[in-house]
Amino acid sequence: MSFLRRHGLSILLVTRSEYFCLRGWPLRLVWAVVVVFLGWMYPADQSFADHLVQRHNLKCSQYFPCPSALRPRVEFWIDVYGRWTTKDAILHDAQRPHRVFKIIKGKACGIKSNTSYIKEQKRQIRLKLERIATMIERKQSITKAKDRHYLNMFPGRSPSVIRRAARNLRCQSGNKDGFRNALRRFGTYGPIVRRVLKDAGLHQDIQYLPFVESSYNPEAYSRVGAAGMWQIMPRTARTLGLELNATMDERLDPEAASWGAARYLKDSRKNLTVAARSKKPNVTDSELTPFVITSYNYGVNGMRRAIKKLGPDFLTVLNRYRTKKFRVAVKNFYAGFLAARHVAKNSGHFFGTYSKGRPLRYDTVILRSSVSIDRIRSVFGISQSRLKSLNPALTRFVWHGWREIPSGYSLRLPPRQGGWANKIAYLRSLPPEAGRGTPKRYTVRSGDTACAIASAFRVKCRDLIDMNRLGRQAVIRVGQSLQIPKRISG
């Protein structure tokens, strides 16, 4: 007997000799043989199903290609975003993520209480794979259903490949519930992103990139210092023209950050096109798109080096390029983008009915002079929480009253019937505020530390570090002038 598997269907084929052999058997006995055979091929335990990654009707485009060799990787991430939840741990091959060995329900990766259990599960899988590799080398028969399940993931049956997979076991949590929340935020911020992309002349489907970067969370921070919906690093922000100082961090503003991301992606395509044409003069935009998207994670220079070494063939780079930083997150970035694009475009299929956030609407007034947040609240009669939701670029030094909103800032206000003209005129008629917006300063002396200075002025060390952008190590130097934040009253 043999199997023909096409489009998710399993058809039992019987050879001519087997047919004549079975023809004389009682029908019940024939069906018993079939059931036993199917049970051997498809064990009932979900953790050992024939293939734990589902097939999806993935529709790509000429601009965003997904070659057949990349599709299994994309389908894995579709399941991460649209099928498995944050309480599921998926044990898989880091180099071939679609090679899923086991799904553990209720045991998310990265949770301290789950560490020992997941570690033991990985150990068992590793031992099983190593045993299978040894059995192949010794030309021993592999008859156990669970062993055959693992073996079927390696069509070439290469012991070295199997052992490599055993060394590359990785735990990936699902994110279906997180993606549902991202879709709600997408309803709020998606229109802003689409407008920016249109004005910048970029493809509209780039709107799905923040799903991968931050789950469309404009308040997201990473462990390495990236911030906002587009996860922009501080140094990159400044090169993209974003304000980043004690009063403003435009990485947290969806519109400003989207313009920054658009500038980055346009520059990336321009620079990578030059690099690619040096290797392949007739390279197409479609061929470059995976490199441009991946550069958002890995950097333009990193992608340029990969192209110069191996040429503008993305699959070749994916499989053969080797550096310390070209690892799991980078290799899966484009596939993750395609997966997020597919899940978001087919959200009804994956999530059914869900609540969508309302598009962000606001009026804007350009401040002619610096002004405190207290005065803004008083003049316009708007709560601080409402103002904060519309003006996320303003830092906590502004919200705490330590610094004024700078002149020239485009202040966003909630829409109002009849507009805000009378309130704006009143604001502009008021005299300057005294004693605000100019914190104390201190000149660093020998032996000082940031936290010792903060203690002397009875302010939080973290506030002093953040206000002066001292970085994670809080390095200061003799003669440096530091701004001292005001203390919060009460």
Give the label of every model feature segment.
Residues 145, 149-192, 199-200, 239, ...:
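Extracytoplasmic and endomembrane cell-envelope/extracellular-matrix remodeling and assembly machinery
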Residues 3, 19-20, 37, 42, ...:
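Aromatic (phenylalanine/tyrosine) cluster motif
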Residues 220-241, 408:
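Short, surface-exposed glycine/acidic/tryptophan-bearing loops
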